[in-house]
From Swiss-Prot:
It comes from Drosophila melanogaster. Residues 445-509 form a coiled coil. One of its GO terms (biological process) is DNA replication initiation. Transmembrane segments: none annotated. Residues 13-23 have a biased composition (Basic residues). The modification Phosphoserine is found at S187, S198. Residues 1-86, 106-142, 172-199 are annotated as: Disordered. GO terms for cellular component: Noc2p-Noc3p complex; nucleolus; nucleus. It is found in: Nucleus, Nucleolus. Residues 35-45 have a biased composition (Basic and acidic residues). A motif (Nuclear localization signal) lies at residues 41-48. It comes from the Eukaryota. One of its GO terms (molecular function) is chromatin binding. This is Nucleolar complex protein 3.
């Protein structure tokens, strides 16, 4: 049966919570006890001092009498009662006379007779009967049993069997009533009691403070158990503290100190060492709290003494200032942790390195979550120096953080600051930095930046000046009309945030200038640096925004690197060639440069990539092929174009299926753009002049026109169905319709999209492999073939002549093959 949900109004719930008292902690109980003692002391001080002295004298005499009776073996309480009654009666008898005095003396005699009658045998017998009755009732209670119902059992037949059992009867202990004085004190204190936070015991770690250390011999197992228990206890404590901070951070700001104590190596409160796991948990927990409660804006400084604020505004300003102080203290703690592994003379142990890695990751998370808050520039400056540390895990974390900030930064303020700090770091280290310092700049969003904007602004200013002179020569009516139009246009520009765009464009221009300053400094001063590969990759990425004045010098420097440095890898060579062709395909077309030597470099390094570890580098070749075969196809001769097609198709046999598809996509696009390549589909070898030499590095003189694209026959039997279809499509002359035509969803994909969509590095085959059909294979019964035609008859006779022997469990057939062979 389902439970019925009952809705309670907010008013009833508030009244219920108001009347409900929270349980008192140990500190609250101690405070109440101290208040009670203070009230009692005030009452005693309020009485007359003479009565106090008299009471002290009486108490002293009574105490001496009690000690004397106790030494004689008598009960001092009984003697006190009798003597006190006698003295009181004698004092009253002096004031009475007549019948009252006689009645008082009769009562005195009855009381004496009652006290002396305890030695009477009848009275002793009655006392014995009472004691026996009490002992019998106690025995009956001990032997009394109570029936309790147990859980029912369901039998195999489906019947439910109820069960009961008998247990001993244990009466509930009677609760003693509180003294009236205590009740009065509690009622007086209820109005003035302030309940403290119920989490204070956990925050102040009262449990650890009260636990006394036990000195005994312990084993390794006990140490591990104690360590795990301490970790679980601190986990619970950190969870309580963090939940309180997230619930109401304005009132729980002091709880940050408890977390900061857990981050230190020695806990200042308990004077004990914190476990490494607890320190990491504390750092991560504080980071998550700040990620949740920090505002998205930058907190300003407000002087509350010089100006009056409303109560709500004052509370908000006070909270923001306190939050800012706690955030600053947390960053100082993280800086101290990272300084141990980054500075000279630091304690570099595996534990400190792991802790510093956690601290760096937390700073990265804070920079990504709140890139515009106070002290975030300090975080970025520290992370820039950690980008050049000796630990790869930290460098990877900072590298990924900077790329994320570059892609998400809308204002470009933090991006500009980070790029400036990286430039300063590379300059001070004299280009001796790790590769991550350069590769993180690849995440910059600087695709559409015009570095010639200043010249264009000067031309625009001249045009506006001439337009102004024309306006001065207009009539008064026309001037008023132009003035109104200008005001309307200005308002429209404000609504479109045109000024914002101009400021953003100016920052973006400054960023790209700083990036190219880094690149050109390394190419000029240290062309053999270990970051040369990253520099060349960055130049290839941003070559389209390089200023036209630097084109010729840059091409000369890259050509010198390609020819002089023999130890240069294939990847660096491909980046150099890609950068040069990107320059020549854009604004560099006006330059009078012969790129024949760069064609040779590219043709020589096309077969360096295969289906191995460097298969991902085939994307560099694809981007270069777009510049060479597509954008500059009209500047290439027929022999060179055919040579590139032949070598490209030869290299496709050494690639994975996604690389082969990208190669075929490039060839298909080139076939569609020019009709020169149709000769390569003809197998007649008499068309060209000479013989094709595939080992020659010069594409102009390898005689590619004398060969054909024989690799298409091999690719037509490829294991991938899309590769087979694409190879047949090219072999048929790239038809749009009819036999050999491609489906629309494959034909519209570019070479880069084919390389990405059909990538199987994530263990996903595209298209999906269908499941085999369920069914049993049909077994065909074949005929027996014999070399001798009479073998079947002789073998039948031999089986008939065989003797059958009987054993206990089975029958055996004995055949004499030896006699049959003779």
């Amino acid at each position: 049966m389902g439970t019925k949900k009952v809705k309670i109004s907010s008013v009833k719930r508030a009244a219920h919570l108001k009347s409900k008292k929270t349980p008192l902690s140990k500190q609250q109980q101690q405070k109440q006890k101290q208040k009670r003692d203070q009230l009692k002391s005030k009452r005693e001080q309020g009485q007359n001092i003479f009565s106090q002295k008299a009471r002290k004298r009486d108490n002293l005499a009574q105490r001496k009498k009690h000690n004397k009776l106790a030494s004689l073996g008598l009960d001092p309480l009984e003697e006190d009662n009798e003597d006190g009654d006698d003295e009181m009666l004698e004092n009253v008898a002096d004031m009475l006379d007549g019948d009252d005095l006689a009645l008082l003396q009769a009562n005195k005699r009855k009381r004496k007779a009652k006290t002396t009658g305890e030695n009477d045998p009848d009275q002793g017998q009655s006392i014995g009967l009472e004691r026996a009755y009490a002992s019998d009732t106690k025995k009956e209670q001990d032997a009394q049993k109570i029936k309790l119902d147990l859980l029912p059992i369901k039998s195999r037949d489906g019947q439910i069997i109820t069960r009961t059992t008998e247990v001993d009867y244990i009466p509930k202990p009677k609760q003693k009533k509180k003294n009236e004085e205590e009740e009065e004190d509690d009622s007086e204190e209820d109005g003035d009691t302030e309940y403290e936070d119920s989490d204070d015991d956990v925050v102040n770690d009262v449990e650890a403070a009260t636990a006394a250390p036990v000195q005994k011999l312990i084993s390794t197992t006990d140490l591990l158990i104690a360590r795990q228990q301490e970790i679980e206890r601190q986990k619970y404590r950190i969870g309580i503290i963090c939940s309180g901070l997230l619930e109401k951070p304005e009132d729980k700001m002091r709880n940050f100190h408890a977390l900061y104590e857990l981050m230190d190596e020695i806990n200042p409160a308990s004077r004990q060492a914190n476990l490494m796991a607890v320190r990491k948990l504390a750092i991560i927990s504080v980071t998550e709290i700040f990620k949740d409660i920090l505002p998205e804006y930058r907190v300003g400084q407000v002087d509350t003494k010089m100006q009056t604020l409303r109560k709500a505004t004052l509370d908000r300003v006070t909270f923001e200032n306190a939050l800012l102080q706690q955030f600053k203290k947390f960053l100082q703690k993280l800086e101290q942790i990272t300084a141990q592994v980054n500075r000279r003379g630091g304690l570099r142990t595996p534990q400190t390195v792991k802790l510093a890695t956690v601290a760096v990751q937390c700073m990265c998370d804070l920079l990504v979550a709140h890139p515009y808050f106070n002290y975030v520039q300090n975080i970025a400056q520290l992370l820039v120096y950690m980008l050049n540390c000796n630990y790869a895990e930290m460098r990877t974390a900072v590298h990924q953080c900077f790329r994320t900030v570059f892609s998400n930064d809308k204002r470009l303020e933090m991006t500009l600051f980070i790029v400036r700090r990286i430039n300063h770091l590379i300059k001070t280290k004299q280009n001796n930095v790790h590769v991550e310092c350069i590769t993180c700049l690849m995440g910059l969003k600087i695709k559409n930046v015009n570095l010639d904007a200043e010249k264009e602004n000067e031309l625009k200013q001249k045009k506006l000046e001439s337009h102004r002179q024309r306006l001065l020569s207009l009539s008064k009516k026309e001037r008023k009309r132009r003035k109104k139009l200008t005001e309307v246009n200005r308002e429209l520009e404000e609504t479109r945030a045109e000024e914002n765009k101009q400021a953003k464009h100016q920052k973006l221009t400054e960023i790209i200038k700083m990036v190219f300053t880094i690149y050109f400094r390394v190419l000029k001063n240290d062309p053999t640096s270990r970051v040369l590969s990253a520099i060349l990759e960055g130049l290839a990425e941003f070559a389209h925004v390089i200023n036209l004045d630097f084109f010729s010098d840059l091409i000369d420097v890259l050509n010198r690197i390609l020819e002089d440095q023999d130890e240069l890898g294939y990847r660096e060579r491909l980046h150099c060639v890609q950068t040069i062709f990107v320059i020549l395909s854009g604004q560099g077309e006006v330059l009078n440069i012969d790129p024949i030597r760069f064609y040779q470099h590219f043709y020589r390094n096309m077969l360096a990539v295969q289906a191995g570890k460097n298969h991902d580098d085939f994307a560099i070749i694809l981007r270069t092929l777009d510049e060479v075969l597509v954008k500059r196809r009209r500047n290439m001769s027929q022999q060179r174009l055919m040579a590139f097609m032949k070598r490209l198709l030869t290299g496709s046999l050494h690639l994975l299926h996604n690389g082969t598809l990208a190669t075929l996509g490039t060839i298909k696009q080139t076939f569609q753009l020019t009709s020169v390549l149709d000769n390569l589909l003809d197998t007649d070898t008499t068309i060209g002049s000479g013989r094709y030499d595939p080992e020659l590095d010069d594409p102009e003189y390898c005689n590619a026109a004398s060969t054909a694209l024989y690799e298409l026959a091999l690719l037509a039997r490829h294991y991938h169905p899309t590769v087979r279809r694409m190879a047949v499509h090219i072999a048929h002359g790239v038809p749009a319709t009819g036999e050999g035509a491609l489906p629309t969803e494959i034909g519209k994909l570019t070479s880069h999209e084919l390389f990405t969509q059909f990538d199987s590095t994530q263990m996903a085959f595209n298209p999906t492999i269908p499941l085999p059909k369920a069914g049993q294979p049909k077994l065909k019964r074949g005929k027996h073939l014999y070399i001798r035609s009479d073998f079947k008859q002789e073998y039948g006779k031999l089986l008939q002549q065989g003797k059958v022997s009987q054993t206990k469990d089975k029958q055996t057939l004995q055949i004499d093959f030896f006699s049959a062979l003779q």
